[in-house]
């Protein structure tokens, strides 16, 4: 049988298709990766109340501090957002598997009335963002007003 026969040409074509398909599947994001990318928007957070402050701890693994924003909107809503980005691909380098999550995340928290929006600090360490919102001092109790009664 000749190597240029239609049968061998067909077999080579099928083998080339299989190689291309296998290579594409190795480089394609997995279903888990696509599904879990949505999880970046619902990142876990804990909120604690201390005697003088509220502390918000938000998991932000792999998010660089320069890609994190902490804002107050509408005078009482703490908005925390960030984005985990994929590294730029270098020429000649390709992913064989993509499982790590990338994407944007955002969490909003309604602040209590006694939150001091002028005294907020944030620090990112070991993949956890800690935002501290100090409390306003309690209002002083109102003293009764005494009205002087005049003689007519």
Swiss-Prot record:
Coiled-coil ranges (or none): none
Cell compartment(s), UniProt: Cytoplasm
Pfam families referenced in this protein's UniProt entry, alphabetically: HSP20
Domain sHSP: 36-152
Record InterPro entries: A-crystallin/Hsp20_dom, HSP20-like_chaperone, Small_HSP
Alphabetic keyword roster: Cytoplasm, Stress response
Cellular component, GO annotation: cytoplasm
PANTHER family to which the protein is assigned, alphabetical: HEAT-SHOCK PROTEIN 20 FAMILY MEMBER
Family (UniProt): Belongs to the small heat shock protein (HSP20) family.
Protein name per its UniProtKB record: 17.1 kDa class II heat shock protein
UniProt source species: Pisum sativum (Garden pea)
The encoding gene: HSP17.7
């Amino acid at each position: 049988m000749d190597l240029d026969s239609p049968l061998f040409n067909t077999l080579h074509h099928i083998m080339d298709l299989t190689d291309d398909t296998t290579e594409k599947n190795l480089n394609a994001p997995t279903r888990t990766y696509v599904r879990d990318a949505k999880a970046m928007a619902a990142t876990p957070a804990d909120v604690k109340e201390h005697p003088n402050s509220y502390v918000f701890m938000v998991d932000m693994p792999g998010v660089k501090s320069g890609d994190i924003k902490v804002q107050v909107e509408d005078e009482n809503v703490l908005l925390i957002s960030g984005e985990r980005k994929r590294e730029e691909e270098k020429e000649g380098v390709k992913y064989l598997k993509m499982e790590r999550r990338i994407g944007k995340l955002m969490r909003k928290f309604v602040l209590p009335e006694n939150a001091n929006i002028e005294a907020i600090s944030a620090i990112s360490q070991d993949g956890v963002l800690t935002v501290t919102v100090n409390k306003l001092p309690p209002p002083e109790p109102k003293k009764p007003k005494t009205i002087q009664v005049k003689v007519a």
